[in-house]
C-alpha cells in the first residue's frame, strides 16, 4: 500500500478536528479498498466471495421534532464488495453531526444513515437502529471454537511476518474453528493500538497451533486498518494452507463509540452482530 496516497493524506485521523453538531454527510471520508487489495491479489470474487464490515455505533443521538434528545444504537453492515471502506474518525464525526439535528422518527434516522453510508462506501450498506430497550436484551457472547492462546511458548519478535505460516498445515483434513484473543495491530495513520479477537473456521489440513499463534502475534506492531488486517489473514491462510473452505472473523474493541467487526468467507454468511466481553 502507498501510505502517501492522496486518499489517505486527506483523512481526519491524527488531525485536530472541529466537532460539528448539525447534520453534515460530507464529514464521511472513504478509503479505497483497492489500495490494500491490489497488493494482496484480491478481486471481487477471490479469494472470498461473501462478507461485510460490521460496525456497532454506540453514540448515536438526535433531536425529535419537539427538540427532545433521543439516543439509540445502530448496527451497520458494509458489504465487502463496496468500492470503499469508511474511515472511522470521519464516521464518528458524521454521527456527532446528528446531535443537534431534528428527525421525525427513528426510521428517518435509519434511512439517512443507510443513504449517506452507501454513497460514501460506493456499495451496499444495511443499517438497523435500535432503541436501548431492545439492545439491552442482547447477550454478551464468546467466539465458538478452540482458543489457542494458552500455549507455553516464548516470543521475542513482534514484527509482522507471514513466514510463520510456512508448513503450518499438516496431517489429515479436518473441519475446526480456532480462536485467539491476542490480536493487536495499530491504526494505519495514528499508530494507536487496535485490540481484537479473531475466529478462523476452516476445512483443510489441520493447522499447527503454535505457528498460527506466532503469526497472529506478529501483527502486534503492524500498522493497518481493521478490515485490511482481516483480509491479510485470509489471503495468507489461503496462500500457505490452501484450505477447501475458510472464514476469518475479527471483533475489535470500540474506540470513539464505534467497534468494527470484519467478516470474510468463501462459504459462510455474515453472522448476527453480537458483542463480546471486551466490547
Swiss-Prot record:
It is found in: Cytoplasm. One of its GO terms (molecular function) is preQ1 synthase activity. Belongs to the GTP cyclohydrolase I family. QueF type 2 subfamily. It comes from the Bacteria. Pfam families: QueF (PF14489), QueF_N (PF14819). NADPH binds at residues 88-89, 255-256. The active site is at 187 (thioimide intermediate), 194 (proton donor). GO terms for cellular component: cytoplasm. It is an enzyme of class 1 (oxidoreductase). Keywords: Cytoplasm, NADP, Oxidoreductase, Queuosine biosynthesis. The gene is queF. GO terms for biological process: queuosine biosynthetic process; tRNA modification. InterPro entries: GTP-CH-I_C/QueF, NADPH_dep_7-cyano-7-deazaG_red, QueF, QueF_N, QueF_type2. Catalyzes the NADPH-dependent reduction of 7-cyano-7-deazaguanine (preQ0) to 7-aminomethyl-7-deazaguanine (preQ1). This is NADPH-dependent 7-cyano-7-deazaguanine reductase. Homodimer. Its EC number is 1.7.1.13. Its main location: cytoplasm. Pathway: tRNA modification; tRNA-queuosine biosynthesis. Substrate binds at residues 86-88, 226-227. It catalyses: 7-aminomethyl-7-carbaguanine + 2 NADP(+) = 7-cyano-7-deazaguanine + 2 NADPH + 3 H(+). The keyword DNA damage does not apply.
Amino acid at each position: 500500500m502507498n501510505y502517501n496516497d492522496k486518499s489517505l493524506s486527506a483523512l481526519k485521523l491524527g488531525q485536530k478536528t472541529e466537532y460539528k453538531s448539525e447534520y453534515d454527510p460530507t464529514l464521511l471520508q472513504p478509503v479505497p479498498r483497492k489500495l490494500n487489495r491490489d497488493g494482496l491479489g484480491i478481486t471481487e470474487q477471490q479469494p472470498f466471495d461473501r462478507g461485510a464490515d460490521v460496525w456497532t455505533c454506540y453514540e448515536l443521538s438526535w433531536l425529535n421534532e419537539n427538540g427532545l434528545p433521543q439516543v439509540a444504537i445502530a448496527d451497520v453492515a458494509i458489504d465487502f464488495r463496496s468500492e470503499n471502506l469508511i474511515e472511522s474518525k470521519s464516521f464518528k464525526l458524521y454521527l456527532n453531526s446528528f446531535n443537534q439535528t431534528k428527525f421525525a422518527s427513528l426510521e428517518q434516522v435509519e434511512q439517512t444513515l443507510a443513504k449517506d453510508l452507501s454513497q460514501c462506501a460506493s456499495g451496499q450498506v444495511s443499517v438497523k437502529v435500535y432503541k436501548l430497550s431492545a439492545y439491552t436484551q442482547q447477550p454478551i457472547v464468546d467466539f465458538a471454537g478452540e482458543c489457542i492462546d494458552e500455549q507455553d511458548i516464548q516470543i521475542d519478535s513482534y514484527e509482522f511476518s507471514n513466514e510463520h505460516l510456512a508448513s503450518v498445515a499438516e496431517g489429515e483434513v479436518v473441519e475446526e474453528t480456532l480462536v485467539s484473543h491476542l490480536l493487536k495491530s495499530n491504526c494505519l495513520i495514528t499508530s494507536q493500538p487496535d485490540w481484537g479477537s479473531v475466529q478462523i473456521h476452516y476445512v483443510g489440513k489441520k493447522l499447527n497451533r503454535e505457528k498460527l499463534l506466532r503469526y497472529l502475534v506478529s501483527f502486534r506492531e503492524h500498522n493497518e486498518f481493521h478490515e485490511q488486517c482481516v483480509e491479510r489473514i485470509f489471503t495468507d491462510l489461503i496462500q500457505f494452507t490452501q484450505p477447501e473452505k475458510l472464514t476469518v472473523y475479527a471483533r475489535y474493541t470500540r474506540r470513539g463509540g464505534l467497534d468494527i467487526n470484519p467478516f470474510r468467507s468463501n462459504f459462510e454468511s455474515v453472522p448476527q452482530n453480537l458483542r463480546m466481553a471486551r466490547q
